[in-house]
A protein has these predicted regions:
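Membrane-proximal, glycine/serine-rich, low-complexity loop/turn segments characteristic
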Residues: 1-18, 24-29, 46-273, 279-285
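Short loop/edge segments at beta-strand edges and connector loops
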Residues: 43
């Protein structure tokens, strides 16, 4: 979730800003911009009066879009986004790296690791040593995102409705992600979301509002993780990407960044979310003018399911071979490990279930130039958290 500060960086007892979506405490990142009708920010006494200690750091009240007083209206929207890295350091090539290593050793009073003949061979492209641009192997220049929105709303004499559907597809910056048959090691996120807001006049004095939101999100990443540290830690001269006999290559000190990113399989996270709340507004003017009551029942359920498809891969360690003059004339390769099939494991990573009931009785009356507004509020909630357990 984004970090939001209403009253500065500090917070009282670490509570943070209280976010209410249609009167229910929920995460603001569960919302799409197109489904927001209004946002109200409360702070200081305004938030304390209504929400007590929980509102000491401010309250953000978000109201989702409701059905309008009109016939059926349909909207369709499509967004295409191109993302590019803000800045990526330019990495040294093999010649620059070899010269830098020699200079560092010289400053410590040690002998050079690479001879002038080795460096000249690197410049000429005749050296057996590698000159791999790991940044180019791992990253591509841009990522492409797609978003499709569909909504329709309207009303009749007794009901107002609003339906919003959203599909999002995001692909990451990794390169060479289709090296394996049957699966990709790209960072990908796909999400499908549906929201329905209904409001009905049950009687002349009773209004019912029901809000439903469901979302399915699938996130995929390489089993080796998404860290870019291997790009910066592995020098271009360490080893070729592949060994001459096939399979990945590396040396004794440094790993093969592309093997970590593309060779170990993938993992997927499936998140399912359901938000539901029902609110009844009752006008009690028949009892006494200015009296009203409100009752809200809420049920939220979110779960994370983690699927992992991992495998081991064979690799060959490259070792320089020196000629009689001490120059690097070749690379020898020693093979380790074996290529294995994808394994499979699936588990419920976590699940959160939350029920909440909220009631309010309100009385308003004008006395000449004075206005009286009194409210009594009752709330009770229950939150249940399930930890990880295997589903097989």
């Amino acid at each position: 979730s984004p970090a939001i500060n209403v009253r500065g960086r500090g917070s009282y007892q670490g509570n943070g800003v209280l976010v209410l979506v249609d009167g229910v405490e929920r995460e603001i990142n569960d919302l799409n911009v197109d489904e927001i009708e209004s946002v109200t920010v409360l702070k200081d006494a305004a938030s304390l009066a209504l929400y007590g200690n929980r509102g000491t750091d401010g309250v953000i009240c978000v109201t989702t879009t409701r059905g309008g007083d009109n016939k059926l209206r349909t909207r369709v929207g499509y967004n295409f986004t191109v993302q590019t890295p803000f800045r990526i350091p330019e990495m040294a090539d093999a010649v620059s790296y070899a010269n830098a290593v020699n200079e560092a050793l010289k400053n410590d009073g040690l002998a050079s690791r690479y001879s002038q003949a080795d460096i000249q061979a690197l410049q000429n492209g005749t050296s057996p040593l590698a000159n791999v641009d790991w940044e180019d192997q791992i990253l591509r220049k841009a990522a492409f995102n797609h978003e499709l929105n569909l909504s329709f709303d309207g009303s009749n004499q007794r009901m107002r409705y609003y339906v919003f559907a959203n599909y999002t597809s995001n692909r990451g910056f990794f390169n060479n992600t289709d090296l394996n048959d049957g699966y990709s090691t790209q960072v990908e996120m796909y999400a499908l979301k549906l929201r329905t807001n209904l409001e009905a006049n049950i009687s002349p004095t009773t209004v019912a509002r029901m809000n439903l939101m469901g979302r399915l999100m699938q996130y995929q990443e390489p089993a080796g993780g998404t860290s870019l540290k291997n790009i910066f830690n592995t020098p271009p001269i360490a080893a070729p990407v592949y060994a001459p006999g096939g399979g990945w290559a590396k040396n004794q000190m440094f790993t093969n960044p592309l093997a970590v990113q593309a060779g170990g399989g993938y993992k997927q996270t499936l998140r399912r979310t359901l938000f539901a709340d029902l609110t009844l507004d009752q006008d009690l003017s028949m009892v006494t003018p200015g009296l009203s009551a409100q009752l809200r029942v809420t049920y939220d359920n979110s779960a994370n399911i983690l699927d992992q498809r991992t495998r081991s891969y064979a690799y060959s360690i490259a070792t320089p071979v020196l000629d009689n003059a001490g120059n690097i004339s070749d690379l020898s390769y020693t093979r380790y490990g074996n290529d294995t099939e994808l394994s499979f494991s699936s588990k419920l990573d976590w699940q959160v279930m939350r029920t909440y009931i909220w009631g309010k009785v309100n009385y308003e009356k004008d006395f000449g130039m004075h206005h009286l507004d009194v409210a009594g509020i009752f709330s009770k909630g229950r939150k249940k958290y399930l930890k990880a357990n295997n589903t097989y």
